[in-house]
UniProtKB/Swiss-Prot annotation:
Signal peptide bounds: 1-18
Family per record: Belongs to the apolipoprotein A1/A4/E family.
Keywords recorded for this protein, A-Z: Chylomicron, Endosome, Extracellular matrix, Glycoprotein, HDL, Heparin-binding, Lipid transport, Lipid-binding, Oxidation, Phosphoprotein, Repeat, Secreted, Signal, Transport, VLDL
Methionine sulfoxide, modified sites: M144
Record protein name field: Apolipoprotein E
Gene transcribed to yield this protein: APOE
Organism, as annotated: Hystrix brachyura (Malayan porcupine)
Transmembrane spans: none
Amino acid sequence: MKVLWAVLVVTLLAGCQADVEPALEVGEPAPEVREPAMWQSGQPWELALGRFWDYLRWVQTLSDQVQEELLSSQVTQELTVLMEDTMKEVKAYKSELEQELGPMAEDTKARLSKELQAAQARLGADMEEVRNRLTQYRSEVQTMLGQSAEELRARLASHLRKLRKRLLRDAEDLQKRLAVYKAGAQEGAERGVSAIRERLGSLVEQGRLRAAQTSQPLRERAQAWGERLRGRLEEVGGQARDRLDVVREQMEEVRAKVEEQAEAFQARLKGWFEPVVEDMRRQWAELIEKVQVAVGASTPAPSEKH
C-alpha cells in the first residue's frame, strides 16, 4: 500500500507540470484535445463532470442552434446546473473519503485535505470561467462594437479550446489527488484494522488466561462443596435410617398393644354373652318341654270295642 501511495504521489506531481498554451490566431487549426473516456464510468463526480464536458463540446461546435441559444441565457443556465452538480458530487466524495481517514496522522490528513481543496477550487474556477466567457460573448454579439460576428466566433472558439484543455488538466489533477486521498484512507483503514486485530488478539489471550486463573479456584471450591454435600447427605441418610428403625420399633409396640387390647375386649365380650346365651338356651328348652306336655294332655285316649 505504501508503494502504491508513493507511485500515486509521483504521478500527481508529474501531472502538476502544466504547459502554458499559446494563444491561437483566428483561423489557426485547433490542437486535438483528448477525450476523457474515464469520466464515462467512474465516481459520481466524474460522471457529472463528463456531462459538463459533453455539453461544452457541443457548445464548442458553434452550430446555428448553439449560436441561437447563446444569444439567450439557455446555455449559461445549463452550464450552471451541470457545474453545481459536479461540485456537489466532488464535495460528497471528498467527505466520504475524509470519514475513512480516521487512523491517519493529523498533519498528513491536513496537508492532503489542503491540496485536494485547492485542486477542487481550480476545477470550479475553470467551469466558472467557461460560463463567464459565454456570457461575455453574448454581450459582445449584442453590442457588435466594430467587430464582425465571424471574428467574435473565432475568438470564442479559441478561448473555449484553451478553457477546455485547462479544464481537462485540472480535472485530471483533481482525480489524481483524490486517488492519493483514497489510498491514504485505505492505508489508514488497514492500519486501524491491523491495530484492532492486534488489540483484540491481546484481549482474547488475556481473557483466556484470566478465565483459566479464575476457573481453577472455582473448580476447587466446587469440589470442596461437593465433598461437603456428599458428607451431609450421608449424615442425613444415617439419621433417616436411625429414625426409621425407631419408628419401626414404635409401630411394633403399638401393634402388640392393639392385639392385647383386642384379645382382652374379645374375652370381655365372651364373658358378657356366654351367660346370656346359656340362659336363652335353658329358657328355650323349658319352652319346648311345656309345649310337648300340653300337646300330650290334649290328645284323647283310644276307645275299646266291645
